[in-house]
Amino acid sequence: MKEGLLERIRAIGHWRVVMRPRSPLAERLTLQRCFEEVERARVSIRGWDYPHVGYRNDEQGGTERGGDFVENWCDWNTQIEFWRMHRSGQFLSYSALYDDTDALAEQREPGRQLNAVDVIYSVTEFLEFGHRLAQNGLYADGFQISVGLIGTQGRRLVAGRGRMPFMDDKSTAAAKVEVERIIEMAGLEAGATESALGVLVEFFDHFGWNPAEGQLRAEQDAFYRRQFG
């Protein structure tokens, strides 16, 4: 990984996602298959894939093989992230929060905004990726997932472009918001949208926002149809 990249991500708001199979794999993955599993399951709906699979090897990105994992990283424009797939099937990713890296970030008070629609899209991508790993056979028995957003203390939700603004403050005093789930066979059959919905309901509750599930589903449906606000 590029020197200092993880420290830069940790210095601002960022997502940390961990997934692992519910049951140990019958056979450990080869390093090549670690890369191929991520490559095959990545989610590319809004123009930038999660996890991002890059093929360059320079100051803006690269791939490295460790003793029992493959990792891929990116440091380009607003996209600062890395992922790691272990031979055990455990997946880890760190992604800088777009609210802290976009073109307007320097004009805002650092670490104070969280776009609710972007959260819906991101969490849905995380669960879609996990479900694809399951569908492809890696997590055939289901998987455990931890979705964490670090750097949330004092951060307030904003509704997002084209949405009705919140009438009152929606914020949290917690430094980190983390939601954990075990996705069993019934959850796999219900689909990624339903898995993500449960995570979103719990996540937004930390900010004092408790929308009807139908409102969140509508945003998810628009996401899958690529009708971005």
Please annotate each region the language model reported.
Residues 1-229:
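Bergerat-fold GHKL/Histidine-kinase-like ATPase
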